Amino acid sequence: MNRSEKAAIIEQLKARAEGASIAVVTDFKGMSVEELTRLRVKLRENGAEYHVVKNTLARIAFTDGAHDVIKDVFKENCAVALGFADPVAVAKAVTDFAKTSKIFTVRHGSLEGKFLSGEQVSDLAKLPSKPELIARALGTMNAVPTNFVSLFANIIRGLLYALKGIEEKKAAA
């Protein structure tokens, strides 16, 4: 690989990393092409990409960027998953794949510029996804007016039953 090819790889990876909300560094040593392809498909379904790049090029690409906190973890056989949509979905995809593979491990990550250990990436994967959190928040906000309307309707219904009882009592007398 000549110098211009290396520079192109660095620029491409740097540009992709700048647009990513999460970057997860993994160890892929000993994985087959079939396993890597399955991982890439799973990540693509969750709005992410998986890049196997030389460590030196990755260190240069991640210097002075949104995810520069992970530039020093590129050692031995590393690859990086870059997530552009929901960071939780990417963390889940990588963590789930690590559970099914004996070789694949999650090393570190970066979420919006904050360093994450492999354990923290696994913890992030346990959280509900962004759409689930939005649905829960909307459900909670919707519950307050619904409960208020139900309470108000019960008060009015009780008043009507009381008035109906008084009316029946007067009609019987």
From Swiss-Prot:
Entry keyword annotation includes ATP-binding: no
UniProt protein name: Large ribosomal subunit protein uL10
Similarity comment: Belongs to the universal ribosomal protein uL10 family.
Assembly with partners or alone: Part of the ribosomal stalk of the 50S ribosomal subunit. The N-terminus interacts with L11 and the large rRNA to form the base of the stalk. The C-terminus forms an elongated spine to which L12 dimers bind in a sequential fashion forming a multimeric L10(L12)X complex.
Taxonomic lineage of the native organism: Bacteria, Pseudomonadati, Thermodesulfobacteriota, Desulfovibrionia, Desulfovibrionales
Entries under CDD domains matching the protein: Ribosomal_L10
Domain of life: Bacteria
InterPro entries: Ribosomal_uL10, Ribosomal_uL10-like_sf, Ribosomal_uL10_bac, Ribosomal_uL10_bac_type, Ribosomal_uL10_CS_bac
PANTHER family listed in its UniProt record: 39S RIBOSOMAL PROTEIN L10, MITOCHONDRIAL
Listed GO CC annotations: large ribosomal subunit
Matching PROSITE patterns: RIBOSOMAL_L10
UniProt-listed GO biological process terms: translation
Molecular function per GO: large ribosomal subunit rRNA binding; structural constituent of ribosome
Summary of the function given for this chain in its UniProt record: Forms part of the ribosomal stalk, playing a central role in the interaction of the ribosome with GTP-bound translation factors.
Species per Swiss-Prot/TrEMBL record: Nitratidesulfovibrio vulgaris (strain DSM 19637 / Miyazaki F)
